[in-house]
């Protein structure tokens, strides 16, 4: 820093008077230097945070398409959109206060995955463990434990699914209904609610359809505490997307 000050003094002597210097004294130069150091440190922190986020997201099951989803970049075109964004944001911000699960119900392409991913991204940035899995992948992983060569048992897999801070199960109702699928989802929801951990569900089915598919017991568990049920009852946004917009 002393060298910078000496250089500034020499520069003042040789610079023509009509040229206005950026710094008029040693204090201004010192302040600028400190500010540049602060900006550089913040840039490094942001880069490290982004790299960490990418690694965590890779393990969270959040698809690449949704990794940049936030509450701020959700397209709001009417009051329904505004309502679900506000409710989802409030859910994420109050996550630590009590156990609360959520169900996002509605047509495909209405923003359920966007807001579920926004919740997941927010919680991950705040140090929470998050996992999103489709029912198809969930059942595939469960069935893979039946293989005698697999080191992961069904019990261990269920424990892992029960221990993340927020588990989100996607595409409920997309599969051909099976009793075993219902039993597995029931076990997961039961274990998680018993340990006061939140679960999220995404489905194209309405309340009646989900109740028939999963049973009243599961739906009751999902509605414990300050749980959230949002209905996305508008047309698909994807119909309005052209070319590279998506």
UniProtKB/Swiss-Prot annotation:
Enzyme class: hydrolase
GO CC annotations on file: primosome complex
Lineage: superkingdom: Bacteria
One Pfam family it belongs to: IstB_IS21
Enzyme Commission (EC) number: 3.6.4.-
InterPro entries: DNAC/IstB-like (IPR028350), IstB_ATP-bd (IPR002611), P-loop_NTPase (IPR027417)
Subunit structure comment from the entry: The helix loader is a DnaB(6):DnaC(6) complex with a crack opening large enough to allow ssDNA into the central cavity.
Role this protein plays: Required to load the replicative helix DnaB onto single-stranded (ss)DNA, to initiate chromosomal replication. DnaC alters the inter-domain and inter-subunit interactions of DnaB, inducing an open ring conformation that allows ssDNA to access the interior of the DnaB(6):DnaC(6) ring. Has ATPase activity only in the presence of DnaB and ssDNA. ssDNA binds to the central pore in the DnaB(6):DnaC(6) complex, making contacts with both subunits.
The protein's name: Replicative helicase loader DnaC
Recorded name of the encoding gene: dnaC
